[in-house]
Amino acid sequence: MATWSNLGLQDSASPLMEQLNFFHDHTLLILIMITILVGYLMLMLFFNKFTNRFLLHGQTIEIIWTILPAIVLMFIALPSLRILYLLDEINSPAITLKTIGHQWYWSYEYSDFMNLEFDSYMVPTNELETNGFRLLDVDNRIVLPMNTQIRILVTAADVIHSWTVPALGVKVDGTPGRLNQTNFLMNRPGLFFGQCSEICGANHSFMPIVLESSPTNYFIKWITAMNSN
């Protein structure tokens, strides 16, 4: 989900997404090198006018094209395994947010606070304000503190959904009867948008996610106001 004038990935808002960006660039560089090498060899063979009538086998080249791809795969697999481990590791979360997917809206529960839960629906186009984002704005945003370890629990009430915020590098499937979890830490304030990433019915495209990252003191004020209401 690109933003204005953005042809690549979104700017990262969490250390995990930053690691994913680095891994993307690392892997893309390897793929470009492979493409150039294979293209060069194909062109050389295509325009080569020499023939070897006595070639029976090429044991040396067979060993090379077996070992070389294995080494290249190691350079891709090891960073990938490291990031997969980091994505699953949860270190002493300060706040737990429970997310429930419905057809076609999200419900949120702040498990660490008393009676703090709400539903989040997409704002229809005819009710959207001038500075709103079409098909991305919601009536109730999630508000979470920045520079804080957050754990998110995701499930669903009807069919399979997927809670996804690209700027944070978070994508968790919500499956009825199961509770999936992941963690993230937002390192800058701002609004981060996401959408359901699992086809879940007719209005699958109309259940966006809006997460507001704010300093801790503003988050405490928001929590106090929500509890008083």
Swiss-Prot record:
Family label = Belongs to the cytochrome c oxidase subunit 2 family.
Could you tell me where this protein is found in the cell?
Answer: Mitochondrion inner membrane
Q: Which residues bind Cu cation A1?
A: 161, 196, 200, 207
Please name the source species: Simulium vittatum (Striped black fly)
Pfam families per record: COX2, COX2_TM
Catalyses which reaction(s): 4 Fe(II)-[cytochrome c] + O2 + 8 H(+)(in) = 4 Fe(III)-[cytochrome c] + 2 H2O + 4 H(+)(out)
Q: How does the record say this protein sits in the membrane?
A: Multi-pass membrane protein
Note the InterPro entries from the entry.
Answer: CcO_II, CcO_II-like_C, CcO_II_C, Copper_CuA, Cupredoxin, Cyt_c_oxidase_su2, Cyt_c_oxidase_su2_TM_dom, Cyt_c_oxidase_su2_TM_sf
The biological processes this protein is annotated with in GO are: ATP synthesis coupled electron transport
Q: Which NCBIfam families match?
A: CoxB (TIGR02866)
Instruction: Enumerate the UniProt keywords alphabetically.
Output: Copper, Electron transport, Magnesium, Membrane, Metal-binding, Mitochondrion, Mitochondrion inner membrane, Respiratory chain, Translocase, Transmembrane, Transmembrane helix, Transport
The residue ranges for the Mitochondrial matrix side of the membrane come to: 49-62
Q: Which GO terms describe its molecular function?
A: copper ion binding; cytochrome-c oxidase activity
| Matches recorded under Gene3D superfamilies | 1.10.287.90, Cupredoxins - blue copper proteins
The portions of this protein that span the membrane are 27-48, 63-82
Gene encoding this chain?
COII
Q: Which cofactor does it need?
A: Cu cation
Query: Which residues are involved in binding Cu cation A2?
Result: 196, 198, 200, 204
SUPFAM superfamilies according to UniProt: Cupredoxins, Cytochrome c oxidase subunit II-like, transmembrane region
Record topology, Mitochondrial intermembrane segments: 1-26, 83-229
> Can you say what this protein is called?
Cytochrome c oxidase subunit 2
Query: How is the quaternary structure described?
Result: Component of the cytochrome c oxidase (complex IV, CIV), a multisubunit enzyme composed of a catalytic core of 3 subunits and several supernumerary subunits. The complex exists as a monomer or a dimer and forms supercomplexes (SCs) in the inner mitochondrial membrane with ubiquinol-cytochrome c oxidoreductase (cytochrome b-c1 complex, complex III, CIII).
